[in-house]
């Protein structure tokens, strides 16, 4: 389902809205400046709403890839939860040509998020010899799509047989929707198994937990972003988890956006943070299962909020947890944690981890 967001929700997501070259859009010092951020937010929001209409504002999220091109008149939206790819255009002239170009580029794009600015209309999508969606989508003949010729033929088929249109009250929106293969989630997960195993061995974190976190955070979307500016597959926030991990590794500052958009670096950093939660912040919890529940919840809402569920005193909180059964700890965290998101998060990750343990 599309994300229709009010402008108030757009602001925290915007990183760059410049329509200039890519090198000009990722000036991180500029983005950190409040006034600069406001200008970028206003430009992006104004461009989208003015062209598409207020109820048609669709932006990227943890499980949604959204890329605008053609002066914001064309967009590609991959919903990694639903397994759908929707290509839309509001172009008044030759809409089929705009759709065709976007379909081909989306099907053949690579998996390097650091090279793509999701918050501008810069056409920075490059066709890759190893498309990110390869194996996750098949054409009308049931074949996976790797080369431009097959992608072009499939685009022509879609435009002839699946083209739809609707009105936003002012303009006609033309669209094509592609369903991904039923096991698209497993296809994406498989891409990162080697990186997950390496991080698991390095930090002593169970592979199944890493995979469960990745599934819950991003549905294995390497382009994932969020309103809290969490980035990448494991949704690492630069100034909190990222900074903590860097400090523990003797590094100064915080990881860059390009660093966290690199899948291997993101998985390494996210796993390192899980290890810190397990061994440092929540190391006073004796039972490994109880500690795992606490770590999962803390990955979403912080270790402090987990401990405060039991006591405002951190040491006392750990002591209380150590008197409880793992089942009681789970029940407490899923019913008494102040954040509804964190309560649901523990359930989701724990359920996902069980499925990965069975494989």
UniProtKB/Swiss-Prot annotation:
UniProt keyword RNA-binding, yes or no: no
NCBIfam families: PRK11671.1 (NF008670)
Gene3D superfamilies, per database record: 1.10.530.10
Protein localization: Cell outer membrane
Gene that produces this protein: mltC
Top-rank EC class of the record's enzyme: lyase
Any Gene Ontology CC annotation: cell outer membrane
Signal peptide: 1-16
GO biological process entries: cell wall macromolecule catabolic process; cell wall organization; peptidoglycan metabolic process
Positions of N-palmitoyl cysteine lipidation: 17
Membrane association type: Lipid-anchor
Reactions catalysed, as given in the entry: Exolytic cleavage of the (1->4)-beta-glycosidic linkage between N-acetylmuramic acid (MurNAc) and N-acetylglucosamine (GlcNAc) residues in peptidoglycan, from either the reducing or the non-reducing ends of the peptidoglycan chains, with concomitant formation of a 1,6-anhydrobond in the MurNAc residue
Enzyme Commission code: 4.2.2.n1
Recorded family membership: Belongs to the transglycosylase Slt family.
Protein name: Membrane-bound lytic murein transglycosylase C
S-diacylglycerol cysteine lipid attachment residues: 17
Matching InterPro entries: Lysozyme-like_dom_sf, Murein_transglycosylaseC, Murein_transglycosylaseC_N, Transglyc_AS, Transglycosylase_SLT_dom_1
Pfam families noted in UniProt: Mltc_N, SLT
GO molecular function: hydrolase activity, acting on glycosyl bonds; peptidoglycan lytic transglycosylase activity
Function: Murein-degrading enzyme. May play a role in recycling of muropeptides during cell elongation and/or cell division.
Coiled coil regions, renumbered to chain: none
């Amino acid at each position: 389902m599309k994300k229709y967001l009010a402008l108030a929700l757009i602001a925290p997501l915007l990183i760059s809205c410049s329509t200039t070259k890519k090198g000009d859009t990722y000036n991180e010092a500029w983005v950190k400046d409040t006034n600069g951020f406001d200008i970028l937010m206003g430009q992006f929001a104004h461009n989208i709403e003015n062209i598409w209409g207020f109820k048609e504002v669709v932006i990227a999220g943890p499980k949604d890839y959204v890329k605008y091109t053609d002066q914001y008149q064309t967009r590609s939206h991959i919903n990694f939860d639903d397994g759908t790819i929707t290509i839309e255009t509001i172009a008044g002239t030759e809409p089929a040509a705009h759709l065709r170009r976007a379909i081909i580029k989306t099907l053949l794009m690579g998996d390097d998020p650091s090279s793509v600015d999701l918050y501008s209309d810069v056409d920075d999508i490059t066709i890759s010899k190893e498309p990110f969606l390869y194996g996750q989508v098949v054409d009308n003949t049931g074949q996976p799509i790797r080369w431009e010729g097959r992608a072009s033929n499939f685009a022509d088929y879609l435009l002839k047989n699946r083209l739809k249109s609707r009105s936003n009250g002012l303009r006609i929106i033309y669209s094509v929707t592609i369903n991904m293969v039923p096991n698209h989630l497993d296809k994406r997960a498989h891409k990162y198994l080697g990186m997950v195993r390496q991080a698991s061995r390095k930090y002593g974190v169970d592979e199944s937990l890493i995979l469960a976190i990745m599934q819950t955070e991003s549905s294995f979307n390497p382009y994932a972003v969020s309103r809290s500016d969490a980035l990448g597959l494991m949704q690492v926030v630069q100034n909190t988890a990222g900074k903590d991990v860097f400090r523990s590794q003797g590094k100064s500052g915080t990881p860059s956006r390009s660093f966290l958009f690199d899948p291997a670096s993101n998985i390494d950093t996210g796993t390192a943070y899980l290890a810190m939660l397990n061994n440092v912040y929540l190391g006073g919890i004796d039972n490994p299962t109880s500690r795992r529940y606490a770590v999962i919840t803390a990955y979403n809402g912080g270790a402090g909020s987990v401990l405060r569920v039991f006591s405002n005193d951190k040491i006392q909180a750990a002591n209380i947890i150590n008197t409880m059964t793992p089942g009681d700890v789970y029940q407490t965290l899923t019913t008494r944690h102040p954040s509804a998101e964190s309560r649901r998060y523990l359930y989701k990750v724990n359920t996902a981890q069980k499925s990965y343990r069975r494989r």
